[in-house]
Every structure is written in structure tokens, then in C-alpha cells.
């Protein structure tokens, strides 16, 4: 189920992030390969065995990574029908580890930022539905965060990341709020 890592990075640094994760994975004996597109702002590290992506996240300290802004363990890319995306996601995550929050993200590129408005609206509706049905628990005991990484309104990766071993900020980018004058 979790044979892939989606790794977000700054656009143009995909090759450096690929080299970094490949080296770190090899150090702990988990092998795979990277799929990337130059300038996409993310890449995939596909592990040789199912479950290895979560094992990588257990053994590598996220804060020790230099080029990777955010990560999540997931399966293959999903193509969801626009008619009932929330229902489809709810059905898919029944076998996922218990999560305590939802984070909707997209590539930090010009094309990716166009998904921002959709991501905010969809994320809010999805979180409300999952909390209402009890699929997402508010307790910190869960320790995992559900991630949706949007590529379009219907294409996405659905995965998880440990709350304490991933970036605390959406898309791995800290945002500063300036006081009003």
C-alpha cells in the first residue's frame, strides 16, 4: 500500500532531493528509484517493497534532510471522479493508519499555485466530513497526518506522514504573519 514517498522540494531542486533520498535510503538498506520532472517542485521515490515508504519515514529524521520540504508515504497516483471525490477518499482511507488531521497540498510552482483556492475549499469540506464520520480523530494519540497532494482537480496522491517526523507547515514552507499597522 505505501510503496512510494512524495517529496516536496523547491522547484529546480528535484535532482538534489532525489540524490539525497536515494543515498539516505541506501544507508538503511531500502532500495528504490526516483521519478521526477525538472521544475515540478516534487518527486516520487518508489520503494522496492510495499510498506518500505513508512519504514523510511521511521528511520530517517525529517529534520536531517536538506532539500526536502515535506514528505508523505503513499501508493500510486489516484484519478478521482469529480462527482464524489470526498466519498472516494473516505472509502480509500479505511485501511490507513489512524490520522488526527488532514493536509491538502500542491506543488509550489506557478501551475501548482493555481490549485490553491480549490485546495482550501476542498480541504475544509473533506476535514469536516472525515471528522463527522470519525475517520479522523482530533486526539494527538494518532500521531499521523493524512496528506492529499493535488496535481489537478481529479489527480492526486493520498498518503500519510508522522506528525512528529514531517514539516509542521503546509507544503513545508513556514509562513510569517506580519502585524497590521
At which residue positions do the language-model features occur?
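Hydrophobic residues embedded in beta-strands of well-ordered beta-sheets
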Residues: 43, 154-156
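Charged, structured surface patches that assemble and position nucleic-acid processing machinery
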Residues: 149-151
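Glycine-rich adenosyl-nucleotide cofactor-binding module
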Residues: 156-181
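A short glycine-rich, hydrophobically flanked beta-strand micro-motif that places a catalytic Asp/Glu
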Residues: 144-147
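Non-catalytic nucleic-acid substrate-recognition regions in nucleic-acid-modifying enzymes
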Residues: 2-10, 14-142
Amino acid at each position: 500500500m505505501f510503496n512510494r514517498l512524495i517529496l516536496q522540494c523547491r522547484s529546480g531542486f528535484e535532482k538534489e532531493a532525489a540524490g539525497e533520498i536515494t543515498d539516505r535510503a541506501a544507508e538503511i538498506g531500502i532500495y528504490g528509484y526516483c521519478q521526477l520532472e525538472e521544475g515540478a517542485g516534487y518527486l516520487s521515490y518508489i520503494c522496492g517493497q510495499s510498506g518500505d515508504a513508512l519504514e523510511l519515514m521511521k528511520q530517517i529524521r525529517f529534520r536531517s534532510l536538506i532539500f526536502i520540504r515535506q514528505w508523505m508515504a503513499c501508493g500510486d497516483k489516484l484519478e478521482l471522479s469529480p462527482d464524489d471525490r470526498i466519498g472516494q477518499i473516505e472509502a480509500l482511507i479505511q485501511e490507513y493508519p489512524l490520522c488526527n488531521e488532514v493536509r491538502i497540498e500542491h506543488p509550489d510552482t506557478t501551475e501548482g499555485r493555481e490549485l490553491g483556492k480549490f485546495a482550501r475549499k476542498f480541504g475544509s469540506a473533506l476535514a469536516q466530513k472525515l471528522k463527522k464520520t470519525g475517520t479522523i480523530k482530533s486526539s494527538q494519540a494518532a500521531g499521523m497526518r493524512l496528506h492529499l497532494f493535488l496535481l489537478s482537480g481529479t489527480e492526486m496522491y493520498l498518503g500519510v506522514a508522522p506528525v512528529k517526523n514531517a514539516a509542521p507547515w503546509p507544503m513545508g514552507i513556514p509562513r510569517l504573519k506580519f502585524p497590521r499597522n
